[in-house]
């Protein structure tokens, strides 16, 4: 989830 993290 890009809104929460950069990898997923």
Curated annotation (Swiss-Prot):
Q: Which GO terms describe its cellular component?
A: extracellular region
Asked if the record carries the keyword Zinc, the reply is: no
Q: Which InterPro entries match?
A: Kinin_peptide
Q: What GO biological process terms does the UniProt entry carry, in alphabetical order?
A: neuropeptide signaling pathway
Which key words are in the record?
A: Amidation, Neuropeptide, Secreted
Lineage, top-rank taxon, reads Eukaryota
Matching Pfam families, A to Z? Kinin
Which locations, inside or outside the cell, does it occupy? Secreted
Q: Which residues carry this modification: Glycine amide?
A: 8
| Primary role | Mediates visceral muscle contractile activity (myotropic activity).
The family annotation for this protein states:
Belongs to the kinin family.
What this protein is called in its record is Kinin-3
The species is Periplaneta americana
């Amino acid at each position: 989830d890009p809104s929460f993290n950069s990898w997923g």
